[in-house]
Amino acid sequence: MFTIIDYLKFYKDTSFNDVRWNDLDNLLGAILVYLPVPSFKEGKNLKSLYDYALSKTLATSSFMAPKAMEILNMVKDSKRYAEITISDFTNIKNEEVQFGACIIKTETEKIISFKGTDGSLIGWLENFRLAYEYPTYTQKLAI
């Protein structure tokens, strides 16, 4: 069975002209939004994002954070992803709210990637609020 890791390794030097942006590239964005870094607005290419992540890593209980760092390290020098930028990276987690999102820009696409809740108490509360509150505070943040 092939994994996202296999895809990223196989296509790392393949341009988007040869193989268009697709669902597996979207999955890369869905993983990178779990990077344990402070929020930032300006666009960063993957090399800059990696350096930023190394210097600004936040403490986290997310099991996805180490995998996101590993995958970012793997793709930061690839030809395929050399021109994409990550911007409007939002990472909010406190006693009342948990929210994460970023914008991924390619030459032709703009993709918004959202982080899901984790197994922490605030993650459970966020999920519970979906049953009785609309829109939730985090849904408002997403707009």
Q: Model-derived features: where do they sit?
A:
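Non-catalytic, mobile gating and regulatory segments of ester bond hydrolases
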Residues: M1-I143
